[in-house]
């Protein structure tokens, strides 16, 4: 059987790939593996607003109870709320039913350990192994030993109080627009900003189970851009379906992506002596403009593979405080153990208020260099040709030398398709477009 777990838990089309049976098995195997079968597990369960969430929650919880576990059901809450509340409630694990920014037909199941961290590959593999071995040797409680379900109706209040505590002071005087993606942030983000005194304008906060991420949220920011200008807001903030990421819009309606947000936050943290080792962790997909800006600010950047789990790994290893991705997954380790859209939104808002500057002015800390991303079609066994072929390697080296540190070439094989992705950044869009197309042609010619 192929690996069930992807980079962010188990994901697929609900009721087709991610069936009730799969959810039941994951609940049962997860409850067993995460407590080593030594005691009755206590597992926190949360979900986003998808219509399939209730079906999968019922099955997942049945699996947990069948192992004698206690399922603490929080209802609809952001993914980072599950990470935080798993710790706060002293649970053995947390589970989120969500497919993040994906369309409504998808759903997913993701585990956190008792510390609120995403599971390492080894534990995920053990859960899969228990399922594949048909629960051989796994005890089957009966009678009084079967587990119980607890519902906490106001868990979101605990998360809101935690989030408010991540900034000093209030947000009075700020006029803020929020796009909740008809997702899990529809209560928490609005209540938090109102509690902190901001003047709040909201769109896409009427989830009906079917409209999550539909032309809204951090992956579709057109409506928020218009709304910010129309309402005369100081800035806008867009969450994705499970609210583990956040992107911003300045007062003119321009998108301020994760690279800009990280640059603003890292500089502020450094200026206030809160940036340990003057270092931030980013992925290889961050724009070279961020590297140029941070070098000017004397902030070191550590690069990881794409994926917030790799960013977190590096942060934990060296004790860095901030890291993230261009997509708006930003981790503030002083506050939470995973990307947290609401915490990110609050840090940025607090900086805007404290600095008394417009977001467009703060975002001028960096200049985003033009970028082009193309695919070269190759067979799966030829995905490393760009490393192995001397002519291709020589061409890449020549291009980078010509750019003199004001651009770069990034080539990486697709993990799922017979493609090599060719990304170029540089000062002139036309120039890099031509260079990228020529490089794709060369790679494809060499693989025929």
Curated annotation (Swiss-Prot):
It catalyses: alpha-D-glucosamine 1-phosphate = D-glucosamine 6-phosphate. Activated by phosphorylation. The active site is at residue 100. The keyword Isomerase applies. GO terms for molecular function: magnesium ion binding; phosphoglucosamine mutase activity; phosphomannomutase activity. Keywords: Isomerase, Magnesium, Metal-binding, Phosphoprotein. The keyword Mitochondrion does not apply. Catalyzes the conversion of glucosamine-6-phosphate to glucosamine-1-phosphate. Belongs to the phosphohexose mutase family. This is Phosphoglucosamine mutase. It comes from Clostridium tetani (strain Massachusetts / E88).
